[in-house]
Amino acid sequence: LTELIGGAPSLGLNARFRFYRYQPGDFFKTHTDGSWPGSAVVNGKLQADAFGDRWSQLTILLLLSGDYEGGHTRFYPEGESGEAIPVHTPLGSALCFPHGGHPQHYPPAGEKVRQGIKYIIRTDVLYGRTPESEKIQRRWMY
């Protein structure tokens, strides 16, 4: 992982884990993963902005199944009209990539699952906030 983004240090994983299940015919259209403040569990409840000093900059996908066909993650370096780069992630692997306003963000998409069921977990790598990292956030948010 990148130790610094915009001069801000990595501070760990977001406590907000999202679980996804893709069945045959399911897909995820081209999109931009959002950049979010760090979450934490406080008194048994998820608090969305628990710290005030960190934002996510990288997506992490954890692959929990391998007995499916299709469902590759595709990245579009030149936008949706350009050529896609397909990435097959086998069972037990992790895929990490920049999101939000990060200058190296390439919009991802999830190919249609043809057979079987694809299970993944998504979370984020959190980074501190600096004037440079704030510029990265503003490019995405506004």
PLM feature segments, named:
Residues 1-94, 101-142:
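Fe(II)/2-oxoglutarate oxygenase catalytic core
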